[in-house]
Amino acid sequence: MSSKIKLLVMDVDGTLTDGKINMGPDGEVFKAFDIKDGYGINEMLPAHGIVPAIITGRTSKIVENRARELHITELYQGRHDKLDTLKSLMEKYECSRENVAYIGDDVLDIVCMRECGLVGCPADACGQVKEIAHFVSLKNGGDGAVREFIEYIIASQLMA
């Protein structure tokens, strides 16, 4: 990787979370986020001038709350066509594909991954995603995979 990453785009379910949808007796939904991922997003990315963004196919108040907590202003929920949103973000931040990293876990992410210069995925991503990823985390989604990818991005840029 020789170009500077300016934008990290993340999927939620299966990437920032373990992909499970836990439901309470009254239909309330619970999601678990890894604190290490949060530190990487909230502290490490800004320190290196990298903008975090979330594009997810589902809509959830929980995700909105977590994004706010991590100061993620680029939150796009309910996006089944993630590519249009990705292209808008690239235009907004004046990024070429080489300036964009993407981490996701499933086939809906592949169309975006093919447009990014650096692609990562959790250890438990589907096979098609692992085949095109430049970085496969040792961690599963929701268990620090995003933090590992952030550390990889930063280390790669420091070595360049």
Per-segment meaning from a language model:
Residues 27-31, 69, 83-160:
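Mg2+-dependent phosphoryl-transfer enzymes with acidic/Ser/Thr/Gly-rich catalytic loops
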Residues 1-81:
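Alpha-helical substrate-recognition element adjacent to the catalytic core
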